[in-house]
Amino acid sequence: MLDNQNIFYKKKILIYGLGKSGLSAFKFLKKDNEITTHDDKIKDDNKKIIKKKFDFIIISPGIDINKCNLSKYLKDNNKKIYTDLDIFYNSYKRNNKITITGTNGKSTTAKILYDVLRDQKVDVRLVGNIGNPVLLEKKITNKTVFVIEASSYQLEYSKLFKSNISIILNISPDHLERHKTISRYVSAKFKLIKNQSKEDLAILNTKNFYIRREIKLKNFLPKIIKIEKNTNNNILKKINNPYFNTDGNRDNLKFVLEVAKIMNLKKNFLFKTLKKFKGLKYRQEIIFQSKNLTIINDSKATTFSSSMSLLKSLTNVYWIVGGQAKKGDILLLSKKSCKNFKAYIFGNNKNFFINKLKKIMKYESFLDLNSLIKRLFLEIKLEKKTKHRTILFSPSAASFDSFKNFEQRGKYFNYLIKKYINV
């Protein structure tokens, strides 16, 4: 239900960036405000925009104020910059919000929480970086609960947004091409906690170095709930879902169980939901399984850290890796921990991955994914080994060197696999 005290009312507003977020802000605000739009991809008269006086500038997550066309103008007017999350919070202050951020596992954790609440008959909406943009939801009442996935790009310029329950799953170096330093990246993530009040809760993975250091260095108002212990084996037995066998998915599960405890959810419905959860497409997705071979499509893995939980839990692995390497990415994998691994490296940046992996495991390199898959299945055919093998497509890199996004990359991998096996 809309809040009456809306500061974004009868104002002059510039919406910068016309992607999903910007367009949703335009639709939400146009009725009661004087709106001007700008997108760097569309030819506009920048001088006219600069001369106008705006009360607010709503910036889309994809806009980097250090690189965009109106960079100086935005920096000079930084105090006026807000986000769609700010508009959303200002409009729906009364509604309960659970917001998830972190380097890895945001979408999966948000989807599990959404499924859990939906199955408990809660009027719940899945929004943000997953699902609808936050401003497109309709038929909202005071009882509506929002599960929000928030990226560092969304949080970076937010000034008002806060959540009743905030979750930071983990932090490892990522998006440094935008944030420049790990310190700035951490600060963007902790915007989620910074705006909270004493009545709010922050659930944090304090085993994580960057999270642990941040809460030692700074004082935050919300009650901090530390996630440190492993998930109880009895609970895992009750859930009985192989999806939660990897370290990463068990870590995500711990946060879900903590929220369920806080919200006093019914355990029988909770375990029933968790038992049937199958995961999201292209995220540790098992696309084929037989007696001797498992094929996993983990195209969403865009850093080494996002591949680690699977790599640590597997043996006898054909690891397909490659793409646009990310600035500051660190591989924390030893030769000892790689039991019978072989890397199949593809793409224009293959030398980066060769240098990272050559002392840890055997490898072959290929110009593209097509020639790699062809060679891999020939090798499997010639092998006489009876051990169970896993083909792991977990690129540990961004997809933009060859693909539009990780979804297109994941879809292409499935297409190639279907040439050799019935997926």
Which sequence ranges carry the predicted segments?
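Short acidic low-complexity segments
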Residues: 6, 41-53, 368
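Short internal beta-strands
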Residues: 36-39, 202-206, 320-321, 340-348
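Nucleotide phosphate-binding/pyrophosphate-handling subdomain across enzymes
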Residues: 3-12, 23-28, 123, 242-340
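Short, charged/polar "capping" segments at the starts of alpha-helices
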Residues: 43-46, 64-69, 208-214, 232-233, ...
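C-terminal helical cap/extension that packs against the catalytic core
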Residues: 330-388
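Phosphate-binding loop of NTP-binding sites
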Residues: 11-12, 23-32, 46-54, 61-202, ...
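Glycine-rich Rossmann-fold phosphate-binding loop(s) that bind the pyrophosphate
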Residues: 18-19
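NAD(P)-binding Rossmann-fold cofactor-contacting core
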Residues: 32-44
